[in-house]
Amino acid sequence: MRYLATLLLSLAVLITAGCGWHLRDTTQVPSTMKVMILDSGDPNGPLSRAVRNQLRLNGVELLDKETTRKDVPSLRLGKVSIAKDTASVFRNGQTAEYQMIMTVNATVLIPGRDIYPISAKVFRSFFDNPQMALAKDNEQDMIVKEMYDRAAEQLIRKLPSIRAADIRSDEEQTSTTTDTPATPARVSTTLGN
C-alpha cells in the first residue's frame, strides 16, 4: 500500500512538472534577468512597491540604481495614468458606475543590446453611490491599489517576451552579417570633367 501511494505521488509530481504547470502569480523570468535594477522616479510610490514585490516573488534580485555594475538589465518605470470614464448613469443623470483605466509605461534596458518598451493596461469598474461618499472613496482607493498590483503582474509577465525579442534580434543580426556577400566598393562611372 505504501509503495502504491509513493508511486501515485511521484506520478502526480512528474505529470504536473512535465506539463509546465506552475504556481499562480509567478512568471518564469529569464535567467539573464534574475538580477535587475529597478529604476523609478518615485521609488516609494505604489507602482514601484508593487513591481518590487512582484520581482521578488518571481526570484529576481534587485540592485540599487546607483550600482557600478553596467552589465545588469534595468526596468525603468515610466508614466502612470489613471482615467475615469462614466460607464452608466441613474435616471436623473448622475453617474451610477465608473470605469477606471490605468495605463503604465515602462522600458527594459538590456546593456549592450537595446531598449524595449512595455506597457500594461488595467480596467476596473465601480459603482458610485452618492449617499455613501466615504465608503465610495475607500472602495476607490482599494480598487486603485489592486490595479497597481495587476499592472505590476502584467509588466513582469512581459519579461520573457522581451528576452525572446532580444534573441530574435540577435539571430537576425547574425544572419544579415553572415549571409550577405561583401560588395565591392562603388566606383563612379563619371569622369571629373
Curated annotation (Swiss-Prot):
Protein location: Cell outer membrane
Cited InterPro entries: LPS_assembly_LptE
Transmembrane segment boundaries: none
Keyword Membrane: yes
The keyword Lipoprotein appears for this protein: yes
Signal peptide annotation: 1-18
PROSITE patterns to which the protein is assigned, alphabetical: PROKAR_LIPOPROTEIN
Lipid-conjugated positions (N-palmitoyl cysteine): C19
Membrane topology, as annotated: Lipid-anchor
Extent of Low complexity compositional bias: 174-186
Covalently lipidated residues, kind S-diacylglycerol cysteine: C19
Keywords: Cell outer membrane, Lipoprotein, Membrane, Palmitate, Signal
GO molecular function, one term: lipopolysaccharide binding
Predominant location: membrane
Any one annotated GO CC term: cell outer membrane
Region (Disordered): 166-193
Gene Ontology BP, a term: Gram-negative-bacterium-type cell outer membrane assembly
Subunit structure: Component of the lipopolysaccharide transport and assembly complex. Interacts with LptD. May interact with LptD during its assembly by the beta-barrel assembly machine (BAM). Directly contacts LptD at a wide range of positions, encompassing multiple surfaces of LptE. In one specific interaction, LptE contacts a predicted extracellular loop of LptD through the lumen of the beta-barrel. This specific interaction is required for proper folding of LptD and assembly of the complex. Also interacts with LptM, which promotes the efficient assembly of the LptDE translocon by the BAM complex.
Family, as annotated: Belongs to the LptE lipoprotein family.
Function: Together with LptD, is involved in the assembly of lipopolysaccharide (LPS) at the surface of the outer membrane. Required for the proper assembly of LptD. Binds LPS and may serve as the LPS recognition site at the outer membrane.
Protein name: LPS-assembly lipoprotein LptE
Lineage: Bacteria, Pseudomonadati, Pseudomonadota, Gammaproteobacteria, Enterobacterales
